Amino acid sequence: MTLPAVPVSTVAEPPPEAAPPSRAERTLDRALRVTGGVLTVWGGVLLALLELIFSTWAWELLQGRSGAAQALVGVGAVVVGVPVVVAATVLLGSFGHRSTGGRWAVVLAALPWFVVIVAGGVRTVEGDLALVGDNVLGLALIVAGAVTFAVVGFRHLVTPPPVR
């Protein structure tokens, strides 16, 4: 003797549609995205300035040493400096991506970073130069930052956008 079966649907019910956002919510969202973009641009400028200051300071510190002390300070500056640059660049690119909601947002950080780095390599009227050609640490930081921006940008562009 069998009992009658209860009918069960095998197709999942679609979730109820959410109401479209109000005008105030859209305005707030747009304002937050613009603010995130502005913060990302200023973060790129600040990151480049800090990299130039660190590379110049570490290079001068390295030039004041000789022998084993020079090697120890140089290795320490590279071991600390390059991973910090890579981590800060990844964090800045991710912040730009999340705060603006656009996959292209890493450009907001990368363009001012490149402009400041290039400006650091140009001699001023007074003769000041933030990034000299023999500063190997500065060149390593530039390469690390540029490659990281390229990888982060490529990663954000290749990843499919989230389903909303």
Explain the meaning of each model-derived region.
Residues 144-164:
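Membrane-water interface at the C-terminal end of transmembrane alpha helices
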Residues 34-38, 79-97, 106-107, 139:
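Hydrophobic alpha-helical transmembrane segments
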